[in-house]
Amino acid sequence: MIEVRGLTMRYGRTVAVDDLTFTVKPGLVTGFLGPNGAGKSTTMRAVLGLEIPAAGEALVDGHAYASLRRPMRTMGALLDAGAVHGGRTARAHLGCLARSNGIDSRRVAAVLDQVGLAEVADRRIGGFSLGMKQRLGIAAALLGDPAVLMFDEPLNGLDPEGIRWIRDLLRSLAGEGRTVLLSSHLMNELALTAEHVVVIGRGRLIADTPTGALAAQFQRDVLVRSADPERLAEILRAHGVSVAPEDASDTGMHGTGMHGTGGLFVRGMDAAEIGELALRAGIALRELTPRSASLEEAFMELTEDSVEYGAGPAARSAAVSEVAR
């Protein structure tokens, strides 16, 4: 596991990480989220022993990473894909890492093949694209066949095929029982990849929860379609709930309101209660769908007061409208 306990990081008067505590467990891909300046990269550097905490600790399998004799066999990490010697070949770069950690040289060829760089293994890294460097960084993280893996923005520079590849790779690694921590600003990808999320803002923990549960906290409404929407709307309003007709902009259908789609957006009553009410009234339902926020929307709401540089109200309102479409 990765354990962060009461971690505090200070730079002069600035508190970058503030008494942060969370655990990254094996068998899951855990997303590590936060706005720019939230302290994500600082926390990951502390896990690797690259930053000295003012208080608290960050442990890998119960030990400080710097105390491990062969650290790459315990934990693999990618923080900066560009932090490589451009004059070396991919094979030579991984070979040096392997020798430094007592790793069999045969692993070099294996991980180069695994990340799709076997054909360019003897090319100098300085000529690699960002996506190729990301793949090389991932190969380095996998080199020691570690049980714990940590990646900071590994999707940067990858094309759609590469993004799908790493999504499948991370899931398969977690499926083998490994611990996987993934930091990324690509919310749609995290929603598809991460089963658990840790959200921080201004260095403090905001949420530590399953991905689905986070979105469910921000349930917007229930979409209801029935054969008699006007009567159902009247009954629902009589029970004190908010009812709005579904218009064409929400469905892509022609026509508006209840006459156009038969859809209602209901707030203040859950799906089960709406279904029971419709049953008692003898109204057949065609659809009953709770609509929760996306991971991106939930993240924006959670971190609204934690952003380092925020847009003005007008721009923020426009951005939220775009997300909701």
Q: Locations of the language-model features?
A:
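ABC transporter nucleotide-binding domain
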Residues: 166-266
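ABC transporter nucleotide-binding domains
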Residues: 2-4, 9-201, 207
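C-terminal coupling/interaction segments
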Residues: 267-325
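Hydrophobic C-terminal alpha-helix "anchor/cap" residues
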Residues: 142, 236-237, 278
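Conserved NTP-handling cores and scaffolds of large molecular machines
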Residues: 101, 177, 240, 292, ...
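Short, flexible cytosolic linker that couples an ABC transmembrane/permease module to its adjacent nucleotide-binding
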Residues: 110, 212-216, 312-314
